[in-house]
Amino acid sequence: MNGLYALVYNNYIQSGGVGISKGISLQENGSGSKVLFNSVNITGTDVVNGQALEVLGGTNYTIKNNIFANNGGGYASYFASDLSSFAMDYNDYFSTKRKIAFYNNINYDTLSAFSAVTGKDANSKSVNPYYTSVTNLIPNHTLLNRTGIAVTGTTTDIDGATRGVNPDMGAKEFSPCVNDAGVNEFWGLSNPLPVGSQPIKVILQNQGTNTLTSATIQWEVNGVAQVPFSWTGSL
């Protein structure tokens, strides 16, 4: 967008391929534009020009309750503009390569580091939304459920359902699974992987609403199923 004002809300946005993949792009000369309740999924393989959110200029933007996910290895957000006048919070930023934000020529691989420098996104998240599919952008992560903030004038979701007092992040109001465990990330893997056998550690995350006391982890090596791992505890 390259104009004075725009309201962008309640959208599913997916972009893939091998070239430039942009979700929402705010260009120069904008003022007061609002980006609210959008679900973005970038699957393009360009790790530099793949950006779920791009801000190249403008002032006084409001950016809230969005999911900016880059599953192609690029940036969740890219800023070439001063953020001091922005109202930016209650968003989810996710990148498979930990490229949460690019700002002032620095890549921030954690949301906490980006927030500490900018003073923005204090209530935002950095989790994989686990979209239902590449193009069906209903999230399935409990940390995005009821963790947004109400915004005047945007009281219904993309399908016309009424948003709650504490709305969900993204374009769609959703109900997470009751019992749902998932692998949040692999721990300590180097890139590229060294030759030979290596221990594999993963971080298991409760993505449902109930406390979990057990889970069975299925896994494969080169397409060959291995002995399932049984976990017990409290999560």
Question: Model-found features: residue ranges?
Answer:
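Right-handed parallel beta-helix
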Residues: 1-17, 25, 31-44, 59-70, ...
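Short glycine/acidic-rich loop motifs that flank beta-strands on beta-rich extracellular proteins
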Residues: 1-2, 13, 17-24, 43-52, ...
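Residue-level preference for beta-strand/loop junctions
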Residues: 4, 59, 165, 195-196, ...
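Acidic glycine-/aspartate-rich tracts in secreted/extracellular proteins
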Residues: 46, 71-73, 92-100, 146-153, ...
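C-terminal accessory segments
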Residues: 92, 108-173
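Short aromatic-centered micro-motifs
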Residues: 101, 156, 219-220
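Extracellular/luminal regions of secreted and cell-surface proteins that mediate adhesion/ECM remodeling
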Residues: 176-235
